[in-house]
């Protein structure tokens, strides 16, 4: 049975032999992040991988991330050690998108501007592109939202209801959730949100903020905008994973901070701060189960199989889906 060090050495050798670009999302296991050429959030990695001069991309993340790279750089080969799903992305597909549009029309919504969070599959991004919409990430969501407001249409935000609600609150707008609010509320809302969510960021509650503030009156609270509106509106800072990292790294070592995002990322920030004055906001382990699936053995096996001409877990998209998804992704990049 090979040790972790044996696997790491073999992986590094295969990466060199195959001339691979290895990228890993911030929420991956530490041993995966350690080997990656680049780590980042979904947008950063999509840009890096699609613009790389490498023809083979190995993406350690969840499925929609690999699809985004394939859509942006269709000629590249994209493989994933594990075809893990994002629970939020699985909450909507092209059929559910069409059904949602039908429900909007039943509520008297004749025109809308769709924004899909990057946590959605390529077919959903393609549908949004067909309706002249755009993709957003947590990092550029405010810029994309401001662009959408200029279209003078009702905004349909999917699939994350929390990010949609938080953006509406940030702009003083009324929001409603499709399938949860009445037809009248949908008709009168400025922003209609699809009823999806992140299972990890739902763990953070207002009570957690109150607990830490009572215990440490000078503590700062930094959270991801996928958290519930009551959490985001009571935090000192809200931002994407990259923005949270930037925020925390600028703090004084003596400044206490509680962070509301995935535990792998928080633990790395704790280590950088010598495990002092840095806390995870929830008492429940905030671990993304699907991000946690990829192991060193998975990475080794997918590289070895590729070298032996037995490639698997390759990302494939239909030409038209890739073309349309790229339109929505490229539009986002131009606007942000």
Swiss-Prot record:
A GO term for molecular function: metal ion binding
GO biological process, one term: 'de novo' NAD biosynthetic process from L-aspartate
EC number(s) reported in the record: 2.5.1.72
Needed co-factor(s): [4Fe-4S] cluster
Annotated [4Fe-4S] cluster binding sites: 86, 198, 288
Subcellular location: Cytoplasm
UniProt: iminosuccinate binding residues: 25, 42, 117-119, 138, 224-226, 241
GO cellular component: cytosol
Catalyses which reaction(s): iminosuccinate + dihydroxyacetone phosphate = quinolinate + phosphate + 2 H2O + H(+)
Entry keyword set: 4Fe-4S, Cytoplasm, Iron, Iron-sulfur, Metal-binding, Pyridine nucleotide biosynthesis, Transferase
Pathway membership, UniProt: Cofactor biosynthesis; NAD(+) biosynthesis; quinolinate from iminoaspartate: step 1/1
Cofactor detail note: Binds 1 [4Fe-4S] cluster per subunit.
Pfam families on file: NadA
HAMAP family, A to Z: NadA_type3
Annotated family: Belongs to the quinolinate synthase family. Type 3 subfamily.
Function: Catalyzes the condensation of iminoaspartate with dihydroxyacetone phosphate to form quinolinate.
PANTHER family: QUINOLINATE SYNTHASE, CHLOROPLASTIC, QUINOLINATE SYNTHETASE A
Annotated protein name in UniProt: Quinolinate synthase
Organism of provenance: Helicobacter pylori (strain ATCC 700392 / 26695) (Campylobacter pylori)
Gene this chain is encoded by: nadA
């Amino acid at each position: 049975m090979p040790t972790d060090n044996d696997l790491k050495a073999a992986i590094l050798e295969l990466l060199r032999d195959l001339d691979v670009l290895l990228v890993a999302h911030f929420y991956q296991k530490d041993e995966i992040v350690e080997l990656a050429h680049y780590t980042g959030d979904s947008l950063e990695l999509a840009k890096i991988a699609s613009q790389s001069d490498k023809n083979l991309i190995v993406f350690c993340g969840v499925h929609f991330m690999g699809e985004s790279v394939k859509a942006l750089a269709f000629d590249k080969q994209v493989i994933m050690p594990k075809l893990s799903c994002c629970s939020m992305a699985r909450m909507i597909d092209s059929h559910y998108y069409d059904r949602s549009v039908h429900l909007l029309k039943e509520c008297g919504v004749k025109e809308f501007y769709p924004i899909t969070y990057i946590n959605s599959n390529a077919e959903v991004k393609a549908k949004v592109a067909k309706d002249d919409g755009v993709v957003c990430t947590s990092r550029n969501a405010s810029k994309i939202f401001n662009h959408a407001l200029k279209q003078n249409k009702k905004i349909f935000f999917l699939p994350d209801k929390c990010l949609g609600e938080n953006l509406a609150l940030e702009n003083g707008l009324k929001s409603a959730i499709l399938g949860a609010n009445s037809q009248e509320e949908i008709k009168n809302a400025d922003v209609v949100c699809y009823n999806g969510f992140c299972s990890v960021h739902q763990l953070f509650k207002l009570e957690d903020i109150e607990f830490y503030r009572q215990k440490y009156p000078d503590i700062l609270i930094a959270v991801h905008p996928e958290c519930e509106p009551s959490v985001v509106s009571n935090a000192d800072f809200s931002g994407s994973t990259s923005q949270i990292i930037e925020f925390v790294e600028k703090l004084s070592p003596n400044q206490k901070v509680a962070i509301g995002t995935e535990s792998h990322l928080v633990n790395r920030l704790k280590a950088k701060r010598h495990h002092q004055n840095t806390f995870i906001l929830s008492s429940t382990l905030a671990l993304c189960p699907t991000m946690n699936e990829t192991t060193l053995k998975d990475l080794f096996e997918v590289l070895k199989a590729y070298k032996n001409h037995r490639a698997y877990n390759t990302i494939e998209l239909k030409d038209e889906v890739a073309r349309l998804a790229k339109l929505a992704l490229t539009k986002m990049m131009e606007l942000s």
